């Protein structure tokens, strides 16, 4: 971490909100602990929070550390607008996708449809487009930290899943696939360095589903934690791991004991030519469909949505929940591997009834069916590994703190971004991008490192580097010693919290422990002039230190 000018010290006597006198509940959820200690606050809107002074200090540190990490790897820092036009998003085709999902926050400005963007691929292309002429202008690698918005359907978990959040993003543009893969490597390394720099160690990387951002390969950076709102699957034998939406399971060649139930789910699939037609998916009832795999099975350029249940009776003569594979012979059908190998299974035979003994080869009253097997299931905990014959997938709770996406020409081609190649012909650059959830990282850091006494921050990431606990701050001599010590520590570039409140020592110590700044310095009238006591929040070790040796704290904090 580079040495930088420290911000002005925070004095608890002037801090908003004032530190609460009552003790923290060590069993409280991390979000409540952050709120109790005055780092974050609630608003009247779900998924929207305030960062109070101490929380803002944390966010600013994470912002600086992540920006440094990307600049170290050759990225140029920029600031892109969050307010973006509908026209721009229609160029990429995502206006319809995101509004259909209900994820886009839209508004009108000056008679123009706009959105508060949840991501900035379109704006990155629009920013590069006027300046890209030749292959000599590539690669372009941009980094930005910005506030984003998403109309999250179920905001929860405090800062973990909100409607307004800060991201550290990066976008890359390259002349060819080899260059793009080099940039993807840089994105992953920059994310790793940034996450390590903010104090998240042991972050796991795993292949993942790119969702509405990318149809190409992606990599999640995950912190394994029991408070995570995501999960990662890993084989308990070979270690093969990833997001369930892209992993494949294997299924027995014959039906397991007890007949599985086969569900039928119908999608409206729009092809590259704009024509929409229904497609049914047959899948085991205890599994979910991976829309990423289904789209890949149908081929490039297909967009799929669940068919409106009200359209089913007119199309197939049955309502949702009563469809069987035999009702879908007039439309396209995909049979997931979870059911294509079954010799016997159960199907719906009415809203409340099930029919056993069905078979793809036919059964009483049912003709044989042609199968179109495909891998379209989402792998789940307990399923057999698709990579090795001996293991099963086990799910672990995790927090997704970063994501790297291989975009290819997904945006650049649609938005007519071109350059002149070395042979003089027009070319389309290949893109990559990444995102680190800075707001989410605040709560993740707090949750990972907290103990029974409260929060614990790694050096350089919390609201301060040093918590100066001034005992008997009402004494004139103590006030003078405080001023000298603060001046010295600030000159050393250390970020400070100064507890100068006229309170008993015990209350100040409890507050310092709960807030979790890595080093507390105790300034007591019992100490000789120039002498203090240092308390390490992580080890609890107390040791004397003189004012002549305060510079050692700078080495510790870096």
Positions of PLM-derived features:
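Acidic, His- and aromatic-enriched active-site or binding-groove loops in soluble protein domains
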Residues: 94-114, 222-237
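TRNA-binding/sensing appendages of the translation machinery
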Residues: 2-109, 172-211, 287
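C-terminal structured "cap/appendage" subdomains that terminate the fold
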Residues: 485-552
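Generic long, charged, amphipathic alpha-helical segments
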Residues: 454-508
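Charged, low-complexity intrinsically disordered tails and linkers
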Residues: 2-38, 122-155, 438, 448-452
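C-terminal, non-catalytic macromolecule-binding modules
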Residues: 432-462
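Extended, low-hydrophobicity, polar/charged segments
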Residues: 42, 121-129, 154-168, 175-434, ...
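Short acidic loop-to-helix transition motifs that present clustered carboxylates
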Residues: 85-88, 311-314, 500-507
């Amino acid at each position: 971490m580079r040495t930088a000018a420290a911000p002005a010290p925070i004095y608890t006597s002037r801090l908003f909100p004032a530190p609460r006198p009552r003790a923290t509940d060590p069993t409280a959820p991390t979000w409540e602990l952050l709120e109790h200690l005055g780092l974050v606050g609630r608003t009247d809107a779900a998924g929207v929070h305030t960062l109070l002074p101490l929380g803002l200090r944390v966010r600013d540190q994470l912002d600086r550390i992540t920006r440094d990490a990307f600049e170290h790897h050759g990225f140029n820092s920029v600031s892109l607008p969050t307010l973006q036009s509908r026209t721009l998003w229609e160029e990429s085709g995502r206006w319809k996708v995101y509004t259909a999902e209900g994820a886009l926050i839209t508004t009108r400005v000056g008679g123009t449809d706009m959105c508060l963007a949840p991501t900035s691929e379109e704006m990155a292309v629009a920013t590069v487009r006027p300046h890209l002429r030749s292959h000599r202008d590539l690669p372009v690698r941009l980094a930005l930290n910005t506030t984003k918005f998403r109309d999250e359907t179920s905001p929860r978990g405090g800062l973990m899943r909100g409607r307004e959040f800060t991201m550290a993003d990066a976008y890359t543009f390259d002349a060819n696939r080899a260059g793009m893969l080099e940039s993807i490597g840089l994105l992953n390394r920059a994310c790793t360095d940034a996450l390590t720099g903010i104090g998240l160690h042991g972050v796991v990387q795993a292949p993942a589903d790119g969702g509405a951002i990318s149809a190409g390969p992606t990599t999640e950076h995950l912190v394994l934690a029991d408070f995570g709102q995501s999960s990662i699957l890993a084989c308990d034998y070979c270690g093969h791991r990833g997001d369930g939406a892209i992993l494949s399971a294997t299924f027995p060649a014959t039906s397991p004991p007890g007949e599985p139930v086969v569900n039928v789910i119908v999608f409206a699939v729009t092809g590259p030519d704009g024509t929409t037609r229904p497609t049914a998916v047959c899948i085991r009832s205890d599994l979910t469909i991976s829309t990423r795999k289904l789209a890949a099975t149908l081929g490039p350029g297909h967009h799929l949505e669940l068919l409106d249940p009200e359209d089913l009776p007119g199309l197939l003569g049955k309502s949702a929940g009563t469809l069987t594979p035999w009702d879908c012979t007039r439309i396209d059908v995909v049979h997931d591997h979870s059911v294509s190998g079954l010799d016997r299974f159960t199907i719906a035979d009415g809203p409340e009834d099930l029919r056993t003994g069905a078979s793809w080869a036919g059964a009483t009253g049912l003709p044989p069916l042609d199968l179109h097997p495909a891998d379209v299931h989402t792998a789940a905990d307990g399923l057999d590994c698709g990579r090795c014959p001996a293991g099963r997938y086990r799910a672990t709770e995790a927090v997704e703190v970063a994501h790297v996406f291989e975009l290819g020409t997904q945006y650049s081609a649609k938005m007519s971004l071109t350059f002149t190649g070395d042979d003089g012909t027009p070319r389309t650059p290949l893109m990559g991008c990444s995102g680190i959830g800075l707001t989410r990282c605040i709560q993740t850091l707090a949750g990972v490192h907290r103990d029974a006494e409260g929060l614990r921050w790694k050096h350089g990431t919390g609201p301060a580097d040093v918590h100066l606990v001034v005992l008997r701050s009402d004494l004139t001599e103590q006030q003078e010693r405080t001023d000298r010590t603060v001046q010295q520590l600030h000159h050393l570039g250390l970020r400070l919290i100064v507890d100068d409140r006229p309170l008993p020592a015990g209350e100040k110590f409890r507050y310092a422990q709960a807030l979790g700044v890595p080093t507390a310095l105790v300034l007591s009238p019992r100490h000789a002039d120039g002498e203090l006591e240092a308390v390490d929040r992580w080890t609890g070790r107390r040791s004397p230190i003189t004012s002549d040796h305060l510079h050692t704290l700078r080495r510790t904090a870096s």
